[in-house]
Amino acid sequence: EGRTLKSGGAWVYDNEIDRVEGDYENGDILAVKDFDGFFLGWGFINTRSKITIRVMSRRKEHEITEEFLEKRVRNAWEYRKATVDTGCCRLIFGEADWLPGLVVDKFSDVLVVESLALGIDRLKPTILSLVKKVLAEDGIMIRGIYERSDAKVRLQEGMERFKGFILSLIHI
């Protein structure tokens, strides 16, 4: 029924779902509809999580493609440039940037990433590539990406915990 989603939230909880139509795997992106079939948004599903669906867009025409993800990354970066010192900043702030479950902090030319949801974890390599591309357009070359995805919630999402460099051009 999507009460939370209808009232402006970006999540659908397990007790708000009547049925899921068609085949899917946890982490897949699905069209979310109310009980009358009215489109509510695109979101990724994970039946292992109490937050069963995390919505990435409320617009039917926004299929989740690489182009869509680039727009999300670009919008987040443009917003940060207009509002904060971007030398060190939270570049992507999960649901606030419509990339639920993903946090990307920028410290000069190093990124620190946290992924808290299975669906966004699948998209993480593409999103990080797009972050590097968008920043490079402003002359910022990323020399390292450190992942700090060690929160316990990852286990509930069906993912392993991880902490370490996933890209390192820095000699330590």
Residue ranges: model-predicted function:
Residues 85-97, 105-168:
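N-terminal auxiliary segments of SAM/dcSAM-dependent transferases
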Residues 170-172:
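Conserved small/polar residues in nucleotide/adenosyl-binding loops
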Residues 1-108, 137, 163-166:
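Non-catalytic accessory regions of SAM-dependent methyltransferases
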